[in-house]
């Protein structure tokens, strides 16, 4: 592991952490989730489905499925269907990323204040983080949906920093997806916050763009 980068990241007094693909090695399940759900409904999914819904919240994805694929179910029921396909993985098998865990533990030892900001389900997120032993290190687990925002704009990170009274110029935002890194960089440009990007199996095609946007980058898969 890059011990120098771990030390640098852990030196930030405030940290905002994405979960899937950043803390947890879970993106392999999300990549196929939408397609798996449609197949379960007897619908052939389009090839570009994963990239289409990547930046959406669960609620937005469910509404999209209603509109585009004629799923005649309420949004909460569609979301429940999504989650039923991956809940067991969160509760039993999805591991933490070693590099992320090392930063989190060292940052906690340094007295850093940290939160999670995810587009995933809050309860499943907490269960998974508890199982891998990382939940106690975070002040709170926030979801973009509960904040009434998404990760396509830097505004959500600015809102979190304001809500938790994080000093922006001393805050590190940890993300993996291109759209989220771009939004985090936007927040950084506005506030002075820095961005650490994590490489993942789901972002390899965008990695050069991600590296160009982030202040720091963790290269290993």
Where do the protein language model's features map onto the residues?
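Sparse recognition of residues in long alpha-helices and their boundaries
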Residues: 35-37, 50, 78, 98, ...
């Amino acid at each position: 592991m890059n011990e120098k980068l771990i030390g640098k990241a852990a030196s930030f007094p405030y940290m905002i952490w994405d979960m899937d693909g950043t803390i947890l090695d879970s993106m392999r399940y999300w990549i196929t989730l939408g397609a798996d759900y449609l197949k379960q409904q007897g619908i052939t999914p389009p090839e570009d489905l994963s990239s289409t819904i990547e930046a959406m919240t669960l609620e937005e994805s469910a509404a999209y499925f209603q509109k585009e694929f004629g799923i005649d179910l309420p949004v909460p029921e569609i979301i429940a269907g999504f989650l039923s396909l991956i809940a067991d993985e969160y509760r039993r098998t999805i591991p933490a990323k070693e590099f992320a865990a090392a930063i989190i533990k060292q940052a906690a030892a340094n007295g850093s204040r940290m939160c999670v900001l995810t587009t995933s389900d809050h309860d499943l997120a907490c269960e998974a983080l508890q199982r891998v032993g990382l939940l106690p290190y975070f002040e709170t687990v926030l979801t973009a949906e509960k904040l009434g925002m998404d990760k396509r704009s830097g505004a959500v990170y600015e809102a979190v920093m304001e809500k938790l009274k994080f000093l922006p110029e001393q805050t590190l935002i940890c993300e993996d997806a291109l759209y989220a890194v771009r939004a985090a960089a936007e927040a950084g440009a506005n506030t002075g916050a820095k961005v650490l990007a994590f490489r993942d199996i789901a972002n390899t095609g965008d990695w050069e763009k991600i590296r160009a946007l982030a202040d720091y980058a963790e290269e290993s898969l």
